[in-house]
C-alpha cells in the first residue's frame, strides 16, 4: 500500500515538474518569439518608422509567401499569353523590363509604397530594418565600426557553405581575415592574372567557333554552362595552381552545396530543425565533408607552389592557431572566394552578354573599341584598362542586374544612422536594386540600358552598390572586373550576338539574382575574325 502511494506521489511530482517545465518553455518561447521583437518594433514606431503587422509565430513570412505566389502566377500567365501570341519577333527583346523587383521581391515593393523608404518587418523572431533612404544608406556605408557586422540571420543554415569565412565573420575575426586576403587582390597581382584569364577562355571560344562551323554559320545556344566553366577555370587556376582540375571538381560540389542551402527555412531556424538529420541537412553535411577533405588534399599536394590557397595557408600558419582552426580557416575562405569569385562573376557575364545581344549599337561600339585598342594583339592588362566603353557596359549591367540583391548588416551594438536609432541585434537590409533604380539618383531613364551614364563621373557611395560599400566592400572587385572584361572583349571580338527567340526573361533570386531559364543567344562569326 505504501509503495503504491509512493508511486502515485512520484507520478504527481513528475507530472507537476513536466507541467512547470512546459509552462517555462512556453513562456520563454513567447518572450523570445513575440515579446522581444515587439519591443524592438515599438522602438521603431516611436521614431515614426512603420511596417506591416507581424503574426505569431512567423512574423510577416505568410505575407511574403503570398505575395511571391501571386507574382509567380502573374508571370506564368504573362509567359503563357506571350507564347500563345507568338508574334514572331523573338530575339528582339520586346517586352523586357529591366526591373526584377515586382517579380522577385513583390512584398518589399508593396511595403515601400505603404510605409516609405525605411520600414520594419519580421521573420519569426528576427526583426529587419529595410533602408533605401539615401542619407541613411550613405551613413551605413561610411561606418567603419566593428559594431556593424554581417547579418547572423540564417548563418547557421548557411554554415556548410560559408562557415567562418570572410563573407560571414564579424569583429576581429573578420578584420584579421580581410587583412590576409586583401594582399592577394592588390591591383599589381590582378594584372598578372590576365594571361591566365585569356588562356581559360580558349576552350569556350573554340567550342563556339566549332559549333558555328558545323551549323552553317550560326548557332543558337544557352551560354550559362560555358560561362560557368570559364569562371570555374579562372578561379580554380587562381586558387589551386597546377591542381586546378581537381579544383574544378571542388567547385562543382560547392555549387551543389549552394543549391542545398539556398532556400531559407525560418521553421528550421526557430525550432532547431537544422540540427536534425533530415534529407536536406544530410545532403549539405555530406557535401561539406567532401569539400573539406578535397581542399585539404590539394593543400598537401601543392607543396611550395604559389597560388591563392598557398597564400591563405601561409597566413593561417603564421597566425599560430590550432591545426583544426587553421584548416577551417583555409576551407571556409576557399568556399567564400568560390562564391564571390565564381558564381557572381559568371552570372554577371551572362547578363552582360544578354544586354549586348539586346543592344547591337553598344555591341558594335565595344567591338570597335576592342579592335582599336588591341590592334591584332592578344588582350593584356594594359589593353583592358583602355576599354572605356566595355567598362561602362559592365557597370551598367551591374546596375540593372546586381548579383547581390541586398547589402545586409547587423547592429552588433546599439547604433545610429541618419538620425535613426537602431537597437542591438536588428538586421539592416539595403535593397541594391532599389538604390540602382531610384530616378532621383539616376534620372528618368533609370530602367533603360544606358552605359553612357557612367561616362563622366563615378556614382555616389550610396547610389551604386554592386560590390557592397564601405569597410566591407568586396575585396575581389578588381579581379572580377578584369575577368569580365577579358571574357567579354574576347567574345565580342569574335562573335556577333543576337538574343535568341528561345530566351525567356525571368530573373530569379537564389543566393544571387540569376536568369531562371538561362540566357539563349544566336551567334555568328565576326567577319574577318581569327579562326583557331
Curated annotation (Swiss-Prot):
One of its GO terms (molecular function) is heme binding. Its cofactor is heme. CDD domains: CYP714. It is found in: Membrane. Disruption phenotype: No visible phenotype and no change in the levels of 13-OH GAs; due to the redundancy with CYP714B1. Cyp714b1 and cyp714b2 double mutants have decreased levels of 13-OH GAs, increased levels of 13-H GAs, including GA4, and longer uppermost internode. Highly expressed in shoot, spikelet and uppermost internode. Detected in roots, leaves and anthers. Residues 24-532 are cytoplasmic. It is a single-pass type III membrane protein. Residues 1-2 are lumenal. GO terms for biological process: lipid metabolic process. GO terms for cellular component: membrane. Induction: Up-regulated by bioactive gibberellins. Heme binds at residue 474. The chain crosses the membrane at residues 3-23. Its EC number is 1.14.-.-. InterPro entries: Cyt_P450 (IPR001128), Cyt_P450_CS (IPR017972), Cyt_P450_E_grp-I (IPR002401), Cyt_P450_sf (IPR036396), Cytochrome_P450_Monooxygen (IPR050665). Gene3D superfamilies: Cytochrome P450. Keywords: Heme, Iron, Membrane, Metal-binding, Monooxygenase, Oxidoreductase, Signal-anchor, Transmembrane, Transmembrane helix. Belongs to the cytochrome P450 family. Overexpression of CYP714B2 in a heterologous system causes semi-dwarfism and increased 13-OH GAs content. Catalyzes the 13-hydroxylation of gibberellins (GAs). Determines the ratio of GA4 and GA1. Converts GA12 into GA53. This is Cytochrome P450 714B2. The gene is CYP714B2.
Amino acid at each position: 500500500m505504501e509503495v503504491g502511494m509512493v508511486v502515485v506521489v512520484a507520478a504527481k511530482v513528475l507530472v507537476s515538474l513536466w507541467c512547470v517545465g512546459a509552462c517555462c518553455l512556453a513562456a520563454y518561447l513567447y518572450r523570445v518569439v513575440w515579446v522581444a521583437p515587439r519591443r524592438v518594433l515599438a522602438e521603431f514606431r516611436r521614431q515614426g518608422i512603420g511596417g506591416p503587422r507581424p503574426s505569431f509565430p512567423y512574423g510577416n513570412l505568410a505575407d511574403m509567401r503570398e505575395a511571391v505566389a501571386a507574382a509567380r502566377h502573374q508571370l506564368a500567365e504573362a509567359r503563357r499569353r506571350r507564347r500563345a501570341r507568338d508574334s514572331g519577333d523573338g530575339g528582339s527583346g520586346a517586352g523586357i523590363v529591366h526591373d526584377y523587383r515586382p517579380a522577385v521581391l513583390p512584398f518589399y515593393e508593396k511595403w515601400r509604397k505603404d510605409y516609405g523608404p525605411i520600414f520594419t518587418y519580421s521573420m519569426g523572431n528576427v526583426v529587419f530594418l529595410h533602408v533605401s533612404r539615401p542619407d541613411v544608406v550613405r551613413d551605413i556605408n561610411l561606418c567603419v565600426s566593428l559594431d556593424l557586422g554581417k547579418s547572423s540571420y540564417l548563418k547557421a543554415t548557411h554554415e556548410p557553405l560559408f562557415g567562418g569565412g570572410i563573407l560571414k565573420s564579424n569583429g576581429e575575426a573578420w578584420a584579421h581575415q580581410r587583412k590576409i586576403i586583401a594582399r592577394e587582390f592588390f591591383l599589381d597581382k590582378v594584372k598578372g592574372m590576365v594571361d591566365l584569364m585569356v588562356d581559360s577562355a580558349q576552350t569556350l571560344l573554340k567550342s563556339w567557333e566549332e559549333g558555328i562551323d558545323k551549323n552553317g554559320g550560326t548557332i543558337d545556344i544557352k551560354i550559362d554552362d560555358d560561362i560557368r566553366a570559364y569562371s570555374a577555370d579562372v578561379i580554380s587556376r587562381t586558387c589551386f595552381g597546377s591542381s586546378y582540375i581537381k579544383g574544378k571538381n571542388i567547385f562543382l560540389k560547392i555549387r551543389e552545396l549552394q543549391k542545398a542551402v539556398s532556400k531559407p527555412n525560418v521553421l528550421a531556424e526557430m525550432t532547431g530543425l537544422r540540427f536534425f538529420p533530415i534529407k536536406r541537412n544530410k545532403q549539405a553535411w555530406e557535401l561539406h565533408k567532401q569539400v573539406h577533405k578535397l581542399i585539404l588534399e590539394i593543400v598537401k599536394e601543392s607543396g611550395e607552389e604559389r597560388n591563392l590557397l598557398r597564400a591563405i595557408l601561409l597566413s593561417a600558419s603564421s597566425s599560430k592557431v590550432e591545426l583544426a582552426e587553421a584548416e577551417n580557416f583555409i576551407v571556409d575562405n576557399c568556399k567564400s572566394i568560390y562564391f564571390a569569385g565564381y558564381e557572381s562573376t559568371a552570372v554577371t557575364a551572362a547578363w552582360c552578354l544578354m544586354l549586348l545581344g539586346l543592344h547591337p549599337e553598344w555591341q558594335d561600339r565595344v567591338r570597335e573599341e576592342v579592335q582599336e585598342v588591341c590592334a591584332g594583339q592578344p588582350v593584356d592588362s594594359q589593353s583592358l584598362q583602355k576599354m572605356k566603353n566595355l567598362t561602362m557596359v559592365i557597370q551598367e549591367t551591374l546596375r540593372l542586374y546586381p548579383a547581390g540583391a541586398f547589402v545586409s548588416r547587423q547592429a552588433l551594438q546599439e547604433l545610429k544612422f541618419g538620425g535613426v536609432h537602431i537597437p542591438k541585434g536588428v538586421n539592416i537590409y539595403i535593397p541594391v536594386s532599389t538604390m540602382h533604380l531610384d530616378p532621383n539618383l539616376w534620372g528618368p531613364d533609370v530602367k533603360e540600358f544606358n552605359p553612357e551614364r557612367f561616362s563622366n563621373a563615378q556614382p555616389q557611395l550610396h547610389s551604386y552598390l554592386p560590390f557592397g560599400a564601405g569597410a566591407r566592400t568586396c575585396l575581389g572587385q578588381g579581379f572580377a572586373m578584369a575577368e569580365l572584361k577579358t571574357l567579354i572583349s574576347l567574345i565580342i571580338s569574335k562573335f556577333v550576338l543576337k538574343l535568341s527567340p528561345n530566351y525567356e526573361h525571368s530573373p530569379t533570386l537564389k543566393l544571387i539574382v540569376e536568369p531562371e531559364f538561362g540566357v539563349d543567344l544566336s551567334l555568328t562569326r565576326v567577319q574577318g575574325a581569327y579562326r583557331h
